Structures are given as C-alpha cells and as structure tokens.
C-alpha cells in the first residue's frame, strides 16, 4: 500500500513532489514526510552529484570549457535549481523554496567519488550475495 516508517530518497524527488508539478496526489504524499539528514554527528550525509567535464581528447576543449563556465553561471544555476530541485553548486545561488524548506545547512559526507568507483565491484558482490534486487 506504499506506507513505510522510513524510506531513503534523493532530495530532488521530494522537491518535485512538493512543487505540485507531479500532481496533487504527490503533493499530498510529500506533505506527510519529513527529510532527515543522517550521520550529522560523524561522517555526514551521502550526497549525489550531477557532474560535467571535458575529455582529455576532446576535439574542442576551448568551447567545452566555455560551456562548463556557462553551466556554472549564477543565471543557469538558478534556472537549474528551480527546475531540477537539486542543491546549487555556485555560492550565492539559493536552492528552490521546496528544497530550502527542509534544510540547506547539513554536514556532507566527504568520501571521494573516486572511492565509490573503486568499491563498486565489492558493493555489487555484497548485493548479489544478500539477494538484493
């Protein structure tokens, strides 16, 4: 029936639901949950990233760099946070009101993204062994 005492979700899904853009039933459901940022007394909360980069063999690194600078402009960051309900990466850009409603100040886990890649095969083996699907 979709009820649970606790769930794990990316913050932007709750932002979309709170915005009302996913429909009235999603808005009603979102109003029944509370966001909690775990591990604030130790390592911090896991964060996902949406990233962009330039390949070392890119045929047009100058324009690729200009595009990245464009993505990091305050104007584009504001547009992105208002449409994607993700946290901004640029100082001085505030998150959407939906995201801000459950907090903008929390301790982030500083684990290197590279480490996630290194440990991925072990994580997959653990999930396979446990029968996780």
Regions found by a protein language model. Name each.
Residues 12-15, 40-43, 59, 74-77:
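Solvent-exposed loop/turn segments at secondary-structure junctions
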Residues 50-111:
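Mature extracytoplasmic/periplasmic domains
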Residues 1-38:
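Ligand-binding pocket segment of bilobal, Venus flytrap-like solute-binding proteins
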Residues 5-6, 46, 69:
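A residue-level structural signature of the nucleotidyltransferase/glycosyltransferase Rossmann-like core
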Residues 9-12, 47-49, 62, 118, ...:
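Generic recognition of short, well-ordered alpha-helical interface segments
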Residues 27-58:
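Periplasmic-binding protein-like
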Residues 97-133:
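Extracellular/periplasmic bilobal clamshell ligand-binding domains
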């Amino acid at each position: 029936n979709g009820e649970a005492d606790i769930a794990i979700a990316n913050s932007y899904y709750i932002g979309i639901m709170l915005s009302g853009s996913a429909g009235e039933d999603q808005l009603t459901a979102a109003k029944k949950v509370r966001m909690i940022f775990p591990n604030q007394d130790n390592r911090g909360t896991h964060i996902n990233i949406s990233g962009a980069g330039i390949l070392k063999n890119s045929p047009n690194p100058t324009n690729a760099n200009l595009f990245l600078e464009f993505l990091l402009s305050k104007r584009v960051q504001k547009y992105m946070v208002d449409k994607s309900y993700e946290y901004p990466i640029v100082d001085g850009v505030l998150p959407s009101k939906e995201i801000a409603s459950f907090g903008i100040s929390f301790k982030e886990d500083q684990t290197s993204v590279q480490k996630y890649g290194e440990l991925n095969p072990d994580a997959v083996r653990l999930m396979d062994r446990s029968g996780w699907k």
